[in-house]
Amino acid sequence: MTNAAKHLTNGGRELIAFRVGDQEFCVNIMAVREIRGWTPATPMPHAPAYVLGVINLRGAVLPIVDFSARLGMKAAEPTVRHVIIVAQVKSRVVGLLVDAVSDILTVSDRDIQPTPDIASDFERSFARGVLAIEGRMICLVELDSVFPSEEREAA
Protein backbone atom coordinates (compact mmCIF):
# COMPACT_ATOMS: atom_id res chain seq x y z
CA MET A 1 0.00 0.00 0.00
CA THR A 2 1.36 3.44 -0.91
CA ASN A 3 1.82 6.17 1.69
CA ALA A 4 -1.02 8.13 0.08
CA ALA A 5 -3.33 5.10 0.25
CA LYS A 6 -2.40 4.50 3.91
CA HIS A 7 -3.03 8.18 4.63
CA LEU A 8 -6.47 8.03 2.99
CA THR A 9 -7.50 4.95 4.95
CA ASN A 10 -6.45 6.72 8.17
CA GLY A 11 -8.94 9.59 7.81
CA GLY A 12 -7.08 11.45 5.07
CA ARG A 13 -8.60 13.09 2.03
CA GLU A 14 -7.38 14.23 -1.35
CA LEU A 15 -7.89 17.82 -2.41
CA ILE A 16 -7.16 19.82 -5.56
CA ALA A 17 -5.51 23.18 -4.84
CA PHE A 18 -5.86 26.11 -7.21
CA ARG A 19 -5.03 29.80 -7.42
CA VAL A 20 -7.42 32.69 -7.77
CA GLY A 21 -5.55 35.98 -7.77
CA ASP A 22 -3.04 35.90 -4.91
CA GLN A 23 -5.00 33.35 -2.89
CA GLU A 24 -5.07 29.57 -2.88
CA PHE A 25 -8.15 27.44 -2.43
CA CYS A 26 -8.81 23.72 -2.50
CA VAL A 27 -11.79 21.44 -3.03
CA ASN A 28 -12.42 17.75 -2.54
CA ILE A 29 -10.92 15.91 -5.51
CA MET A 30 -14.06 13.75 -5.72
CA ALA A 31 -16.07 16.82 -6.82
CA VAL A 32 -13.73 17.43 -9.78
CA ARG A 33 -14.59 15.76 -13.08
CA GLU A 34 -11.84 17.27 -15.21
CA ILE A 35 -9.53 20.23 -15.69
CA ARG A 36 -9.41 21.90 -19.08
CA GLY A 37 -7.99 24.96 -20.73
CA TRP A 38 -9.94 28.19 -21.09
CA THR A 39 -12.63 28.19 -23.76
CA PRO A 40 -14.47 31.46 -24.45
CA ALA A 41 -18.02 31.28 -23.10
CA THR A 42 -21.21 32.43 -24.80
CA PRO A 43 -22.84 35.04 -22.51
CA MET A 44 -26.35 34.30 -21.25
CA PRO A 45 -28.89 37.10 -20.72
CA HIS A 46 -30.04 37.73 -17.14
CA ALA A 47 -27.34 35.48 -15.66
CA PRO A 48 -25.68 36.58 -12.41
CA ALA A 49 -22.59 38.77 -12.94
CA TYR A 50 -20.26 35.95 -11.89
CA VAL A 51 -21.60 33.62 -14.62
CA LEU A 52 -19.43 34.20 -17.68
CA GLY A 53 -21.72 32.20 -19.94
CA VAL A 54 -21.87 28.66 -21.27
CA ILE A 55 -19.66 26.38 -23.34
CA ASN A 56 -20.32 23.15 -25.22
CA LEU A 57 -18.61 20.30 -23.38
CA ARG A 58 -18.96 17.20 -25.55
CA GLY A 59 -22.56 18.01 -26.40
CA ALA A 60 -23.57 19.23 -22.91
CA VAL A 61 -24.16 22.89 -22.05
CA LEU A 62 -21.77 23.80 -19.22
CA PRO A 63 -22.19 27.06 -17.28
CA ILE A 64 -18.86 28.80 -16.59
CA VAL A 65 -18.54 30.63 -13.27
CA ASP A 66 -15.83 33.19 -12.51
CA PHE A 67 -14.80 31.75 -9.14
CA SER A 68 -13.05 34.99 -8.19
CA ALA A 69 -16.16 37.10 -8.82
CA ARG A 70 -18.38 34.54 -7.05
CA LEU A 71 -16.27 34.93 -3.92
CA GLY A 72 -16.58 38.73 -4.05
CA MET A 73 -13.07 39.29 -5.33
CA LYS A 74 -12.04 41.18 -8.46
CA ALA A 75 -13.54 39.58 -11.57
CA ALA A 76 -11.08 37.67 -13.74
CA GLU A 77 -10.19 38.71 -17.25
CA PRO A 78 -9.93 35.26 -18.87
CA THR A 79 -6.84 34.47 -20.93
CA VAL A 80 -5.41 31.30 -22.43
CA ARG A 81 -3.48 30.85 -19.16
CA HIS A 82 -6.69 30.36 -17.15
CA VAL A 83 -8.18 26.92 -16.60
CA ILE A 84 -11.66 25.59 -16.04
CA ILE A 85 -12.25 23.09 -13.26
CA VAL A 86 -15.29 21.05 -14.25
CA ALA A 87 -16.92 20.12 -10.95
CA GLN A 88 -20.01 18.43 -9.59
CA VAL A 89 -22.05 20.73 -7.36
CA LYS A 90 -24.88 18.62 -5.95
CA SER A 91 -26.88 17.55 -9.02
CA ARG A 92 -25.29 20.08 -11.42
CA VAL A 93 -22.00 20.20 -13.26
CA VAL A 94 -20.37 23.64 -13.53
CA GLY A 95 -17.10 25.01 -14.85
CA LEU A 96 -15.08 27.11 -12.42
CA LEU A 97 -12.72 29.64 -14.00
CA VAL A 98 -9.51 29.80 -11.94
CA ASP A 99 -6.02 31.15 -12.57
CA ALA A 100 -4.22 27.80 -12.27
CA VAL A 101 -4.35 24.41 -10.59
CA SER A 102 -1.37 24.18 -8.26
CA ASP A 103 -1.41 20.82 -6.44
CA ILE A 104 -3.11 17.62 -5.50
CA LEU A 105 -2.90 17.39 -1.72
CA THR A 106 -3.38 14.45 0.62
CA VAL A 107 -4.23 15.72 4.08
CA SER A 108 -5.60 14.34 7.31
CA ASP A 109 -8.50 15.88 9.17
CA ARG A 110 -6.09 17.20 11.80
CA ASP A 111 -4.26 19.21 9.09
CA ILE A 112 -7.41 21.29 8.58
CA GLN A 113 -7.62 24.25 10.96
CA PRO A 114 -10.94 25.98 11.71
CA THR A 115 -11.87 29.09 9.75
CA PRO A 116 -10.81 32.16 11.77
CA ASP A 117 -13.53 34.17 13.52
CA ILE A 118 -12.46 37.24 11.55
CA ALA A 119 -13.94 35.76 8.36
CA SER A 120 -17.21 37.24 7.11
CA ASP A 121 -20.44 35.25 7.33
CA PHE A 122 -20.21 34.65 3.57
CA GLU A 123 -16.66 33.29 3.88
CA ARG A 124 -17.64 31.07 6.79
CA SER A 125 -20.56 29.74 4.75
CA PHE A 126 -18.27 28.17 2.13
CA ALA A 127 -14.89 27.92 3.91
CA ARG A 128 -14.58 24.59 5.71
CA GLY A 129 -11.16 25.33 7.12
CA VAL A 130 -7.64 26.48 6.39
CA LEU A 131 -4.59 24.37 5.59
CA ALA A 132 -1.08 25.57 6.42
CA ILE A 133 1.13 23.56 4.08
CA GLU A 134 4.75 24.35 3.20
CA GLY A 135 4.36 28.00 4.19
CA ARG A 136 1.14 28.39 2.17
CA MET A 137 -2.31 29.16 3.53
CA ILE A 138 -4.98 27.32 1.54
CA CYS A 139 -8.72 27.78 2.12
CA LEU A 140 -10.75 24.55 1.94
CA VAL A 141 -13.95 25.33 0.02
CA GLU A 142 -17.26 23.46 0.15
CA LEU A 143 -18.65 23.94 -3.38
CA ASP A 144 -22.23 23.11 -2.38
CA SER A 145 -22.12 26.15 -0.05
CA VAL A 146 -20.66 28.47 -2.71
CA PHE A 147 -23.67 27.84 -4.92
CA PRO A 148 -26.91 27.81 -2.90
CA SER A 149 -29.86 25.99 -4.52
CA GLU A 150 -31.54 28.96 -6.20
CA GLU A 151 -28.23 30.20 -7.63
CA ARG A 152 -27.29 26.75 -8.94
CA GLU A 153 -30.48 26.86 -10.99
CA ALA A 154 -29.43 30.25 -12.45
CA ALA A 155 -25.99 28.87 -13.36
Curated annotation (Swiss-Prot):
A cellular component term, taken from the record's GO annotations: cytosol
Q: Which CDD domains match?
A: CheW
- SMART domains, sorted: CheW
SUPFAM superfamilies per the UniProt record, alphabetical: CheW-like (SSF50341)
Domain CheW-like, first and last residues per copy: 12-152
Q: Which InterPro entries match?
A: CheW, CheW-like_dom_sf, CheW-lke_dom
| One example of a Gene Ontology biological process annotation | signal transduction
Keyword list, A-Z: Chemotaxis, Cytoplasm
Stored PROSITE patterns: CHEW
List where in the cell it is found.
Cytoplasm
**Principal subcellular localization:** cytoplasm
Pfam families attached to this UniProt entry? CheW
User: What task does this protein carry out?
Assistant: Involved in the transmission of sensory signals from the chemoreceptors to the flagellar motors.
**Protein name (record):** Chemotaxis protein CheW
Q: Which organism is it from?
A: Rhizobium meliloti (strain 1021)
Q: Which gene encodes it?
A: cheW
